[in-house]
Design a protein with these regions (language model features):
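Surface-exposed cleft-lining segments at the edges of enzyme active sites
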Residues: 128-135, 194-195
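Internal, conserved structured core segments that host functional sites
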Residues: 132-182
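Catalytic cores of processing enzymes, dominated by hydrolases/peptidases
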Residues: 165-246, 287
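Secondary-structure boundary elements
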Residues: 144-157, 213-218, 246-251
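Gly/Ser/Thr-rich loops at beta-strand to alpha-helix junctions
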Residues: 62-68, 132-135, 162-167, 201-202, ...
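A conserved C-terminal secondary-structure "cap"
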Residues: 230-289
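N-terminal short beta-loop-beta anion/metal-coordinating cradle
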Residues: 38-129
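N-terminal amphipathic/basic-hydrophobic helices that include classical n-h-c signal peptides
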Residues: 1-38
Length: 289
C-alpha cells in the first residue's frame, strides 16, 4: 500500500485552493515552495504566504505592437521595489525553455510580481515572453487566468498595449469592457475612448482585456499610440506617465526614455568592433596584372 506523508500532499477545500495540492522540495531551476493545478494552470508560488495580498490594480502585458506594454512593465520592475509572487505555467505556451535570472533553465510561464511605491500603493504585474499560437489555446488560457485572478481577489485589470499610428500622434487612452467601469473612469477624469481600436484587437491580451465582466473583474485596455517599432520606449514612457496621472499611483517611473533607448541600442550593438579603415588602407597580399 502506498503511504503519503502529510507534509507532501494536502487536500484543500477552499474555493481558491480547490483540488489536490503538492508541496515540492525538488531542487529544480529554483525550488518551488508550493505548486498546484487550477483549470490547466500549473501554479508555482514563489513566496509565502500563498496569497496575492492587498493591491490597487493589476497591469498585464505581453510582447506586441511596439512592445509598448511589455517594455512599460519591464521598466516598472527595474526602477521599483519588485517581488515575484507566482509563476503560472500552461501547456498552451510555446515550448521554449529559457534561462532565468539565476542562469537556470525554466519552463515557459507567465510571471506575476508585486510592486510597492514609496507612498505605499501596491500594484501587481503579470507578463511573459510569449503567448499560445493557436486561437483555441489562447481562449482556454485567458479564461483560466481570469478565473484564477478573480478567485485571488483581483478586481481591476489593465492590459497595456500599443496602437500603430502616425509618428505625429502621441496619445494615451483607455478602452474598458463594461459600462459601469467606463462611467467610473470618465468620472475620475481618465481619457476613455469609444471608437478605438476601430478594427478590434486579437490575441491573449485582447481576451484578457475583454473577459473581465464574465469573471467579476473591471478589465480594460490602456493604449499608447506608436509607430510600431520594436521596443518603443517613448510610447511606454507616455503610457506609464498617463497611468500614474490618472490613478495617482505614486510609483517610480523610468526617468529618461532616451537613456533607456540608448541602453537598448547598446545591448544590440556588436561586441567586437572591426577596423574597416585599416582594412581598406592595408597593403594587399595579391597584386593586379
Amino acid at each position: 500500500m502506498l503511504h503519503l506523508k502529510k507534509s507532501e500532499f494536502a487536500l484543500t477545500t477552499t474555493p481558491s485552493n480547490r483540488g489536490l495540492s503538492h508541496r515540492s522540495n525538488v531542487k529544480h531551476y529554483s525550488a518551488a515552495r508550493f505548486v498546484r493545478w487550477f483549470m490547466g494552470l500549473h501554479i508555482e508560488w514563489r513566496k509565502q504566504p500563498n496569497d496575492l495580498g492587498e493591491h490597487r490594480m493589476m497591469l498585464f502585458a505581453l510582447p506586441g505592437v511596439g512592445n509598448v506594454g511589455k517594455t512599460a512593465i519591464d521598466g516598472l520592475t527595474q526602477v521599483n521595489q519588485c517581488e515575484e509572487l507566482v509563476r503560472l505555467h500552461h501547456t498552451a505556451l510555446p515550448p521554449l525553455a529559457e534561462l532565468d535570472e539565476d542562469g537556470l533553465l525554466t519552463p515557459p510561464h507567465l510571471s506575476l510580481s508585486a510592486i510597492e511605491s514609496s507612498t505605499g500603493v501596491r500594484i501587481l504585474t503579470l507578463s511573459g515572453t510569449s503567448q499560445p499560437l493557436d486561437p483555441e489555446h489562447q481562449g482556454s488560457l485567458a479564461h483560466a487566468l481570469m478565473h484564477w485572478l478573480s478567485d485571488q481577489g483581483v478586481s481591476e485589470l489593465y492590459v497595456l498595449a500599443g496602437l500603430m499610428d502616425s509618428p505625429t500622434r502621441k496619445e494615451c487612452f483607455i478602452v474598458p469592457s463594461s459600462k459601469e467601469h467606463r462611467i467610473n473612469l470618465e468620472t475620475a477624469g481618465v481619457d476613455v475612448r469609444r471608437d478605438e481600436p476601430s478594427s478590434g484587437a486579437i490575441g491573449l491580451t485582447a481576451l484578457m482585456a475583454s473577459l473581465g465582466p464574465l469573471h467579476g473583474i473591471h478589465s480594460a485596455c490602456a493604449i499608447a499610440t506608436t509607430v510600431g517599432s520594436s521596443g518603443d520606449v517613448f510610447a511606454s514612457q507616455r503610457l506609464l506617465e498617463a497611468l500614474d496621472g490618472w490613478f495617482d499611483l505614486g510609483i517610480a517611473l523610468p526617468a529618461d526614455a532616451q537613456a533607456m533607448l540608448s541602453e537598448k541600442l547598446a545591448s544590440l550593438a556588436p561586441k567586437s568592433k572591426e577596423d574597416y579603415v585599416a582594412e581598406l588602407t592595408e597593403s594587399p597580399d595579391a597584386f593586379y596584372m
